[in-house]
């Protein structure tokens, strides 16, 4: 791309921003800026970097997540009280478990359970605990441990939990090797996490450390393949920071994880939400990737 064609470069960067490929957009701008130091590049690069400052430290990341939930709770108003009442009587737990068990990503996870026959499972990035509780409810002989970065989410998961074989703690997917002994788990899964983290390789290394030889790691990441059919407007992240900072393509996933033992990749179609993105976009492939493989040594 010609760095002197500033408008075209900025359009290309905006395309990546709306795909939530923040690092990719920054790379486009920094490369163009190196070849043509236009002030518009400098301004956009500064803005993009400001959306990634929550990744500068673990504390900043937790603070950003908590602020996001604080704003959400404020908007929910009285619905939050209703939610807490449903928690106390267990109705929300049943609804959450039933809903998660119907998800196609969960059904792919069930195939991994059938394949591995695990005794101990780790959910690295457990959110409000729906997947872990659904797994624990359907497999009472399993022990499922959930690790969640948000203290609020971890607290909600503990309040919702009605299953003695499921537990939750606050922590980081990048640091699970600090919480559990090496080789502790037969199966580890991580749904909608790797698109958030600063360093994918670091996170995967931590997860593989607590996975026994021959155990399997399964993860889900968004599949956002879009087409621009008109001029792309300026972009500002909804939460004031880049909650998702990267996207994965099928080619990248196969290059990175395809050489692993018993690699499996499944495309899970999703529902395109009209109005969520500007009208200049239309989907090519939209949904998620389910990826799994076995750790060497088993």
Across the structure, where does each feature detected by a protein language model lie?
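Conserved N-terminal segment of class I S-adenosyl-L-methionine
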Residues: 6-9, 14-27, 38-181, 191, ...
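Conserved SAM-binding site of S-adenosyl-L-methionine-dependent methyltransferases, i.e.
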Residues: 194
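S-adenosyl-L-methionine-dependent methyltransferase catalytic module, highlighting the catalytic core
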Residues: 187-189, 198-207, 216-297
